[in-house]
Amino acid sequence: MEPVDPRLEPWKHPGSQPKTACNNCYCKKCCYHCQVCFLTKGLGISYGRKKRRQRRGPPQGSQTHQVSLSKQPTSQPRGDPTGPKESKEKVERETETDPAVQ
């Protein structure tokens, strides 16, 4: 191994920079091109700012969908609207009058 000039910065040492520039190709050869390519392409690690995804515009039929939701009636409480006492009495009457149950 040849001696390196001590006055030279480490990133300027011979062989520290690849002879070809980095590119956007993701083939095996380009993924192992240099340490930066290996981290970003091979491992998928990037410490830069994340690109903000653009929100897609609403589909063309969405306006009618929103209108139909607002026209729906409000939810009603579950169970018999007459009340719990009346529903129990109604069940008792039905069981008394139904001869097939016995």
Curated annotation (Swiss-Prot):
Residues 1-48 are annotated as: Transactivation. Gene3D superfamilies: Tat domain (4.10.20.10). The modification Asymmetric dimethylarginine is found at residues 52-53. A motif (Cell attachment site) lies at residues 78-80. Residues 1-24 are annotated as: Interaction with human CREBBP. It is found in: Host nucleus, Host nucleolus; Host cytoplasm; Secreted. Keywords: Acetylation, Activator, AIDS, Apoptosis, Host cytoplasm, Host nucleus, Host-virus interaction, Inhibition of host innate immune response by virus, Inhibition of host interferon signaling pathway by virus, Interferon antiviral system evasion, Isopeptide bond, Metal-binding, Methylation, Modulation of host chromatin by virus, Modulation of host PP1 activity by virus, Phosphoprotein, RNA-binding, Secreted, Transcription, Transcription regulation, Ubl conjugation, Viral immunoevasion, Zinc. The modification N6-acetyllysine is found at residues 28, 50-51. HIV-1 lineages are divided in three main groups, M (for Major), O (for Outlier), and N (for New, or Non-M, Non-O). The vast majority of strains found worldwide belong to the group M. Group O seems to be endemic to and largely confined to Cameroon and neighboring countries in West Central Africa, where these viruses represent a small minority of HIV-1 strains. The group N is represented by a limited number of isolates from Cameroonian persons. The group M is further subdivided in 9 clades or subtypes (A to D, F to H, J and K). This is Protein Tat. It comes from Human immunodeficiency virus type 1 group M subtype B (isolate RF/HAT3) (HIV-1).
